[in-house]
Amino acid sequence: MKANHIRILLLVTIAIMFISLMGKWEQTFPADNTKQQTSATQNNSHYDNADSSTNTDVTTTDAKSSLAKETNFSKYDNAKSITINTGVFKDVKVSLLDGAIISASLKDYSISLDDKTPMSLLTDKSGSEYIAKSTIVVNKQPISVNFEDQGIKIENGKQILTLTGSADGLQITRTYTFDDTKYNISVSQNIKNTTSAPVNVIVDDSFARGFDPAGDSFSLLNAHSYTFTGVAYSTAKDSFRKESFKDISKTNGQPTVINSDGQGWVAFLQHYFVSAWIPQSTNAKIYYKNLNGDVFEAGAFTGATIAPNQSENISSILYTGPIIKANLVDLAPNLEKTLDYGMLSFFSEIIFWVMNHIHSLVGNWGLAIILVTCLIKLIFYPLSAKSYRSMAKMRMLQPRIKRLQETYKDDRQALGKKMMELYKEEKVNPLSGCLPMLIQIPIFISLYWVLLESVELRQAPFIFWIHDLSMKDPYFVLPVLMGLSMFLQQKLSPAPADPMQAKVMMFLPVIFTFLFASFPSGLVLYWLTNNLISISQQWIITRHYQATHKK
């Protein structure tokens, strides 16, 4: 295959990889559940065999079973609630109706650049309901517990809210512990059996969400619509698995239950943010389901048998906040995997680590991207220089190649043979010019996911009109400059021998300008910087080569 053919193929491949393959990989090719589903069984209840002795890995239960009462968000409208504020949370509301956390806003994350209102991650607002609740279940039936506020006390800089309630012969004391600087909330329940017989109790910590944040908003040219929304979970046997809301909605209301096997967590994921329940017991089970097609629920439940006049303590950790690796890595095994950079996450994590350290020095993510690009070009300079020297040599051979084309214009086989002889005589590899592009592909993909998934770059400004590097350039200045840089770079490269190839190459800058117009401006900034450095390197090397090899 000719060098120009390969160069065109690589350029087109980059576009296809981002627009078609990479963008929807997780959604189009969900994780393989074959092994798990082979052990699935049908049970009459979500809470069947809730004790730790069960061996079932995954259970798909009957949609009509009494898993939990279907969520009625409107019941919180007139119910009393307690409001707590911390250094990171604004207006955390705990309903006295059942102890659910029905509201939590993030002080450090505004809704948008134009609306500086703190983003509500948990909310009971109609149309965007998303709550965290802890349900007490007796004999596989949820019981209604109305709580009373016992006040908030401060211990070691932490706010501790205590609620008490009783139902069905049980006395429940629930505490919520808030750390002023952290997004995790410790939820502990002390359940006392005041009856004369043993009681089988389950504590079900769950999320209920009244909508899919992604909805049907996928757009081929909207990079942010490629991000994952749905359920993620981890167990001792399965370190990380995801199920999209779209796939869960196809289960006809049948919940899926998974053994945690001693450790695990369950979470709702959306772009930049995660809410996770982390049970502290070793016999917890994880589940997820869809109710009535428009309410999604996921949680972890723990069972215990409480003897008469005895108590049982069951606790969990609730995390609701940004997907920042440093926040998650110590909370639970594999929780940091919710920061998912895709197939090339190893390279993405290295790139982000370097960018983060540079940002700590320069204080601007745009400058960090530029400096990371310079560093990458410096590392790969020996390979690039070799490629540019080969291209310079090819450029000097153009007159001889044109003469061969004129001589053998009616015999393509002979032309190909003569050109290969020329390349061999001059020790030129026509494919070497593709090497820099090959190197860029994994780096480009890795940086793409860093810019798309890292919450640190959400609403991060650069200069002038670029107020958010995670969003597209509002005036398309960077994509146009990137297209012009591609055009200039083509002028420095050897012209394609085939007129048709030349026309295709001529239109590629226009095509890529159009494609990059919808990409995050930080990514376009990287590509533009990369092109400008490449042009400078190629121009200097070409001039030097021509000056030292004149005949």
Swiss-Prot record:
> Is Transmembrane given among the entry's keywords?
yes
Q: Does the keyword Manganese apply?
A: no
Membrane topology reported for the UniProt record: Multi-pass membrane protein
Sorted alphabetically, which Pfam families does this protein's record hold?
60KD_IMP, YidC_periplas
Q: What job does this protein perform? A: Required for the insertion and/or proper folding and/or complex formation of integral membrane proteins into the membrane. Involved in integration of membrane proteins that insert both dependently and independently of the Sec translocase complex, as well as at least some lipoproteins. Aids folding of multispanning membrane proteins.
Keywords annotated in UniProt = Cell inner membrane, Cell membrane, Chaperone, Membrane, Protein transport, Transmembrane, Transmembrane helix, Transport
Which GO biological process categories is it annotated with?
protein insertion into membrane; protein transport
Q: Which GO terms describe its molecular function?
A: membrane insertase activity
InterPro entries given in the database record: Membr_insert_YidC, Membr_insert_YidC_N, YidC/ALB3/OXA1/COX18, YidC/Oxa/ALB_C, YidC_ALB_C, YidC_periplasmic_sf
What gene is it encoded by? yidC
Family to which this protein belongs? Belongs to the OXA1/ALB3/YidC family. Type 1 subfamily.
- Annotated spans, Disordered: 33-59
Where, if anywhere, are coiled coils annotated? none
**What protein is this chain from?**
Membrane protein insertase YidC
- Residue ranges with Polar residues bias: 33-47
Which residue ranges does UniProt annotate as crossing the membrane? 3-23, 361-381, 431-451, 504-524
* GO cellular component terms attached to this protein's record: plasma membrane
UniProt feature, compositional bias: Low complexity = 50-59
Matching entries from HAMAP family are given as:
YidC_type1 (MF_01810)
Q: Which Gene3D superfamilies match?
A: 2.70.98.90
Q: What is its main location?
A: membrane
Cell compartments where the protein resides: Cell inner membrane
Q: How does it assemble?
A: Interacts with the Sec translocase complex via SecD. Specifically interacts with transmembrane segments of nascent integral membrane proteins during membrane integration.
